[in-house]
Each structure stands twice: as C-alpha cells, then as structure tokens.
Regions:
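Glycine-rich, aromatic-lined ligand/substrate-binding cores of catalytic
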Residues: 55, 286, 290-294, 298-392, ...
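Conserved, well-structured interaction surfaces
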Residues: 38-47, 51-61, 85-165, 178-191, ...
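Long, intrinsically disordered, low-complexity segments
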Residues: 20-21, 117-120, 192-194, 215, ...
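Flexible, polar/acidic helix-loop-strand segments at domain edges
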Residues: 90-102, 351-431
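Membrane-proximal, proline-rich intrinsically disordered regions
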Residues: 20-74, 103, 249-250, 525-539
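Short, surface-exposed recognition loops and adjoining beta-strand edges that mediate ligand/DNA contacts
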Residues: 32, 60-82, 174, 204-223, ...
C-alpha cells in the first residue's frame, strides 16, 4: 500500500470555532522549504489532510475507533449494543445511555467528536489559505485542482458534522474572528455542502479512490458523486430546520440543479448513482471480498480508509472490541468481549429459522466458535458458544453474561495483525457501490418508480430470493447488506423509526418529537460562544 505523507504543520486549532484556541506542536522546519514547489505544496497542504480520515485515538477518525462517529451511528440503533456484562462495560453508564438515547450536552465523547470534525475543517481552511498564498509557484491548473480537492475534503467533514449536530457554523476562512462566527441552520449547511461538491466535482480526478496508486485514499469525483447521492437521499431530513414539529418537505418538492437540469431529490439521487455505474463500479461477485485483508482492488468499494499495519497507526477496533477474550486469544491476540448484534438484528437475518440469510455467517460469529476448525474452550472447560438470543442490555445477572450476543464479523481476520488485532491490513470501507444500488432502489420507490432491479441485484449476489421493492423491504435489506458499516442511525431517521421502541429500548419522554435525531451542541461550545443556540429538546 502507498504511504500517505505524514507531516507536522504549525496551525492554530480553533476548537468549536470560538475563543478556545489550542496550538498544534510548532514545526521546526523552514516554512518556505515546506512550500517551495508544487509537489511539496500538495504533500503538505492537501495530502496531509488525509492523515485525519482514520485514527488510533478515541472519538477520532471517520471509522475504526471507539466512542466516535461510528459508535453514535451504530450503538444508538436497533442494530447493535454494548451490554453491561457484570463488572465489564458499565463505564459510568456510557453504553447503556447511548443505546437508550440518554445523552446530553455534557457528553465528553460528543464534544470530542465535534472537536475532531472541526479540527479537520479548520486545517482545510488553512490549506486553502496556503495554496492561495503560494499560487505563484503553481500553474493555474494545479491551483484549481489542489483547491478543489481540499474543498471536497472539507465538505466531507461538514457532511458528518451536519448529520450529527444539525446546526453548525459555516466558516470558510482560516483567519476568521470570533465575532464573525455564527451558527447556521441545518438547511444552510446542507446547501453549502451540496454547492461545494457540485462546484468542485468536475475538477476532481475521475479515478477510483480505493485502488492502490496515485489516487489511493483520496477524495476523487466518484467519492463526491456518492456523497451527493447520499445528500439527495436524505434531503427531506437535512432541509428540515425544526425536526421536532412533525413537518418536513417531500423529496419530490426539493429541487437540485444537476448539470443544468432541475431534478427533485429522488431524481438527483438516482442520477448520481447512475454516474457511479458509468464510472465503472459494480458489485463484486463475492460479498465478503469487499472486506478481505487485501481489499484494495475491490470493484465495489468507492472510498476507504487505507490501513497497513506496517505503515500506519490507524486502527480498526470493532472485531477486537466484540469478540470474547478466548476468541481473540485463539488468533494470537486479545479481545474485549463487548459489542454484539441485537436480537432483532439476528432475527432479521433469519437466525433460528430454516431461512437464514446467506450473509449471516459472514457478518456475525454465532453459536459454537471454531478457529481453524477447532473449538475454543473457556476457563471452565466448556466450549465457547455465543448465544445470539440471550442478549440483554444488562447481563449482570444472566447465566450468559460472557457469551450472550452474536459478535461482529464482516471483515476477514488478519492473522498477522498487530496490537491485539486492531492494526490490520483490511482497508475500512466507508462508501461502496452496493449501498449506491440500495439508494437508487429507494429513491425510485419514493419517486413512484420501480426499484426492483437494483434491490434484487443485491439479493442475487448472495443467492437470496427476490422480494418486492417497497420501503419496508428496502429498509430491511439495508440492514442485511450494510450491517456494521455505520449507516443504521441515518437510515432509521429517514424511515421515521429511530425514536421508536426496539430491543429493550423505551422511547424517552417527548422523544416522539424527534429531538434525539440530532445530537446536542456540546455545552463547552455554548459556553465559549454565546451566539450558539442549543438544539431542540436539549435546552
């Protein structure tokens, strides 16, 4: 795998876009040497931003670590939970509160997520300033292309910030002053992201980002097209500035300008999904190959976090966090015996019936665990048997407190992994074409069209029978196909299911208003910038 250039760059880090200013370590290198030619400007002002896509620090990275974006999009849903197992996994009520939607503005992990997202946004603004101030060393084409790529990265991070926090500040200048910073409505942030991506997409390389080479791990045109499809699919949500009043626009009445044509949200989503098909993406014949140790040549994966245990410190925690201690030990490392699938999730896969979905064994460890064809034995001499249907949010008094719940699978085990299985060679899949097909199917159905071709292409790939293309089946298929990929919260919100009761979760008082579909603005940010208003329901 190609190395993504590492760098240390002096930069005032304006966390929360407030007077809270931290400074990154000062670089001892001569600034003029760092930016003395086009190659160095690209490495240190553009490529350097990709250092932050993944991480080995809690609450940082778009995926791979714990207590961050992925956990708040997965462990707050009917897909998965991190149950209390006696003396393990209470953690001050963190995981139980996450599952029960009992977070608040003082949640330190939400604050850390906010800091992470805006750190990269601030650094992107700095990079744009650097490119502009050194454009005499660049050709007009280089200035255009470098600027476009940085703006696309910034839009990507604004997308995650908007999706989680709704009303966030739009700041595009590196030298902004506190009195200039205001909080934008969610619809304004949505429009900003769409406009940015549509504006820069023609300047982005029309290359496959997941493949090794010059564009490996970068935001290319297909990445922008996928993100635009995702934005259009969720336009009803993102254009709603008061998500607690029970009203929102219909996607058929939300319009985009797409290549000079006026299209509604669903037509826009379909158009961008079709662009991905034209760009050469297709389903892999083997579903599991997208998550193999060496998955960098997948024809289906669109955007990934490149991992290489010999080059990067970035980590993938989810297998390590989920497997029983003895299970991890059988691979020569360790594990934390934590997260697992909810009962409703394994039942959706048909577990316990004669009609188990063919993706079940790829996505989960269940029943008697075998490694290299051999059973794993617990300290009491009994074989390790995961019990998917015995899961409870608090297992402290359960006979199965150590073994309840089907565990995270999906990614092939890297048998040469470092750090107890957290540093691996499997690239982390963020965007893939299988999701695009399901988005296209959903958009067609919502637009009054037939989405059966796209929906059943997904099922054909794994040898499952065709189903009718309706919204219920599409939501279920998104769980079956995309489990453990970090999309469930967004899907449940879009389908109006996120605030309802499921798997030992009772809705909070007033949660029917939808206030928990957006996380609170961290209190530290409110304290530092009095112009900010708290999100609805958390006042």
């Amino acid at each position: 795998m190609n190395t993504i250039i590492k760098y240390i760059l002096a930069a005032p880090l304006m966390l929360c876009f407030s007077s809270c200013l931290d400074e990154l370590p000062k670089d001892q290198l001569d600034q003029e040497a760092i930016y003395n030619n086009a190659d160095n400007i690209y490495k240190n002002a553009v490529a350097s931003l990709y250092n932050y896509i993944g991480s080995n620090q809690e609450s940082e990275g778009l995926q791979g670590t714990c207590r961050g974006i992925y956990d708040y999009n997965t462990l707050t849903t009917d897909e998965a939970m991190n149950p209390i197992r006696g003396g393990d996994w209470y953690d001050g009520g963190l995981w139980e509160n996450m599952y029960q939607h009992k977070w608040n503005a003082n949640d330190i992990n939400l604050y850390n997520v906010w800091k992470y997202l805006f750190k990269v946004i601030v650094l992107s603004n700095q990079s744009l300033s650097i490119i502009d101030s050194h454009k005499t060393l660049l050709s007009a084409e280089q200035t255009r292309d470098f600027t476009a790529e940085v703006r696309a990265v910034r839009a990507l991070f604004y997308y995650y910030a908007m999706d989680m926090f709704g009303r966030v500040p739009i700041v595009t200048s590196y030298d902004v002053k506190l009195e200039q910073v205001t909080q934008s409505e969610r619809s304004e942030v949505f429009k900003f992201i769409v406009d940015e991506l549509q504006d820069v997409a023609p300047q982005l390389a029309d290359e496959h980002s997941n493949k090794e080479g010059d564009y490996y791990g970068r935001v290319t045109r297909p990445v922008a097209n996928f993100l635009l499809a995702k934005l259009a699919l969720n336009a009803e949500i993102y254009t709603d500035d008061n998500w607690t009043d029970g009203k929102r626009q219909d996607g058929k009445s939300i319009y985009f300008n797409v290549n000079g044509e006026k299209k509604n949200a669903w037509e826009t989503c379909i158009w961008y999904c079709e662009q991905l098909r034209q760009e050469g993406y297709e389903l892999e014949s083997d579903y599991a190959s997208n998550f193999a140790v060496h998955n960098e040549n997948s024809k289906e994966n669109i955007f990934t976090i490149p991992l290489d245990k010999n080059l990067y410190l970035n980590e993938y925690h989810y297998l390590f966090r989920s497997r029983h201690y003895k299970h991890g030990g059988a691979y020569g490392g360790s594990s934390e015996n934590g997260t697992c699938a909810t009962v409703s999730t394994v039942k959706a896969f048909g577990y316990g019936t004669d009609n188990v979905d063919n993706r079940f064994k790829i996505n989960f460890y269940a029943d008697t665990v075998l490694v290299d064809g051999k059973k794993i034995y617990l300290d009491n001499g009994k074989p390790l048997v995961y019990m998917p249907l015995e899961l409870k949010l608090n297992l402290s008094n359960s006979t199965y407190k150590q073994t309840a719940g089907a565990r995270v699978g999906k990614y092939e085990v890297d048998r040469t992994a470092y750090s107890d299985g957290r540093q691996v060679d499997n690239d982390i899949v963020l965007f893939r074409y299988g999701d695009a097909l399901l988005m296209e199917a959903e958009a067609k159905v919502r637009n009054g069209e037939d989405g059966s071709i796209e929906l059943n292409a997904i099922r054909d790939r794994v040898g499952m029978p065709h189903v009718e293309a309706n919204l219920d089946n599409i939501l279920k298929e998104r769980l079956l196909e995309l489990v453990w990929e970090g999309w469930r919260r967004q899907d449940l919100i879009r389908f109006g299911e996120y605030t309802k009761a499921y798997d030992q979760r009772t809705p909070l008082e007033k949660e029917s208003t939808g206030f928990t579909t957006v996380f609170p603005i961290p209190q530290r940010c409110l304290d530092l910038n009095k112009k900010y208003k708290q999100n609805y329901g958390y006042e």
